Amino acid sequence: MSQSGENVSPHERTFPVERVQIGARMEKNMVKVLKALAEYFDISLGDLLEGIVLHAFAQKHPFGEETLKRIAQLKEVYGMGYDASASHRFIEQATTEERG
């Protein structure tokens, strides 16, 4: 029986979707942390972001204590020295290539 059937537990059910490529720009060190976290879970970056968004939309925390500790380590390794209070306050800077 297909996992999208009704006799499957909610955690085993699958959802057919159509994915699209997006051209989003994000802060460089945040992307490094997200990529490392996706690699840690052995999932794609897109899958990780989808999970974070779905949890946020449902007003749930996407990560447990163990993962939050891992994120703190990754933030330190990749120089992500800010938290949620920086939301919507980033100022775009010219890249090294753009400065000449």
Q: What do these predicted regions represent?
A:
Residues 1-17:
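Arg/Lys-rich, low-complexity, intrinsically disordered N-terminal tails that contact nucleic acids
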Residues 18-34:
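Short amphipathic alpha-helix starts
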Residues 14, 29, 52, 99-100:
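Intrinsically disordered, low-complexity regions of eukaryotic proteins
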Residues 38:
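The alpha-helix within a helix-turn-helix
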Residues 30-33, 45, 70:
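Amphipathic alpha-helical interface surfaces
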Residues 58-100:
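Short, positively charged interaction helices/loops
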Residues 41-68:
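Short, basic amphipathic alpha-helical segments that act as recognition/interaction helices
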